[in-house]
Amino acid sequence: MFGVAVLGVVIPASAAHAAPPGNLPQSAGGYESSFSPAYDYDGDGCYATPAIGPDGTLAAGLNPTGAVNGNCRDQSDLDNSQTYARSKCNSGWCAIVYASYFEKDQALPGISLGGHRHDWEHVISWVNQASNQVEYLSTTQHSSVVTYPRSQVRFDGSHPKVVYHKDGLSTHFFRLANGNDEPPENHYHNWRYPPLVDWNGWPSTSLRDRLMSADFGAATIKINDGRFGDLLSRAKPSGIPFDPWA
């Protein structure tokens, strides 16, 4: 058996890092499905994987060491992907938040400086119910959130294109796709639609509550009750009559 030697102790390869849990099947409403992001992932980062399995197993994550994309960008990870969603609609607008989990967020190869185990990144589709299309798109970027008008966003049909991207010497976030992103860099070289689970699509509320209350350290999931309204408030496009707290 091959293994990893650490201070003279041989750790079996199977125990060196835990594989992510299995994903949940697609379970989302028409609105959430229609305006979900079309995803790609730059080569210097991880693929989005499940944060929780059907049996309630939480993702263990990875130490931010080794290669920046080490142990988290295999085709098997891409095949076992997941997106979580939560929406709020009022005053003619719907904000649909899409949350993606990554096993680590590493800034520099070989060392953990500036990085952390676990990463949560979010994309918000702002849908005008009159036009029935995404008019604005927001992405979380480190500790901030940036909102873009439709004119700056590329689409795959009704789906805004975003790319999980390493920000220079810093860590990762979702950026808008651009003309250099064709074809996508993932193993299949196409835009990806991980199985989507919306707020009302969970197999049980207890499984949803387990994820929403889990501690991911420096990474925070922003579709739980404690952070959802604040995220919408910070991301809301100026001038639209949407109430993030309604």
Feature locations, PLM:
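A domain-level signal for the mature, folded cores of soluble proteins
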Residues: H17-E121, E135-A246
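Secretory targeting and sorting signals
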Residues: M1-A18
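Short beta-strand micro-motifs enriched in acidic
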Residues: W126-A130
